[in-house]
Amino acid sequence: MAGRVSTPGASVVSRVFAVLGAFDERHRGLTLSELSRRAGLPLATTHRLAAELVGLGVLARHESGRYVVGRRIWSLGLLAPVQTGLRELASPFLHDIFAATRATVHLAVREGTEVLYLERLRGSESVPIVSRAGGRLPLHSTGVGKVLLAHAPEQVRSEVLASLRRITPYTVVRPEVLSAQLERVRRDGYATTADEMTLGASSVAVPVLRGAEVVAALGIVVPELRRDRQRLVAGLRVAAQGIGRVLAG
């Protein structure tokens, strides 16, 4: 578990980070006992740290008794260079795509073996969306994730291919199939998905380059891609090139 600390005599800082690390995309709200177990800390220690973090606004506690990440963490996260620089520079281009398509638009980067969503502009309510700005999703089941995975170091690709998880009946979980898809992404310059993360949602994404380096992925989520794929790819490429020029200064 991400937040687990089992070393005797661990510092206060490491214990605080163990508590914060207990939260993830699938564990957004935790009871005290769940928080204690996932952090690998004694219940009394967890209770004391959680109470202090609630007082500081780092955690919040619902009426149900569950703890969630507080607004202060989100506010601090927005100050990170990867958030402020890329997100702000890309914003006009994301809004241009959104205005032209009225579809959900994503800007994302890779963090380890997951997609980190820097921005999400929500489109049609008829398309199911599970992403959120600041949230993380698997690389292998999202359009932006496949772009980032295709251009990730070999070690990252190997780690992802060795632990593919089925999310819907259409999620690609055969390593040889995903490897072939990633090769096409590198060759064609874009990635697509269909019902792989959420049923009823398809996506298309392209890389954002700073020079020769892929620094992010830009994507759109729509009900289906059969008619508009090339038009959406063309629009995304124009926007990605614009972001790349701005990043290059």
What is each residue range found by the language model?
Residues 88-100, 184, 188, 242, ...:
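Amphipathic alpha-helical regulatory segments at dimerization interfaces
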Residues 1-83, 230, 241-249:
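N-terminal helix-turn-helix
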Residues 72-100, 126-129:
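Conserved segment of winged-helix/HTH DNA-binding domains
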Residues 107-112, 121:
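Short hydrophobic alpha-helical segments used for membrane anchoring or interfacial signaling
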Residues 9-13, 66, 70, 83, ...:
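Short, structured helix-loop boundary elements
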Residues 170-244:
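Extended hydrophobic
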Residues 59-60, 107-108, 208:
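A structural signal for short hydrophobic beta-strand segments in well-ordered beta-sheet cores
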Residues 125-197:
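Short, solvent-exposed recognition segments
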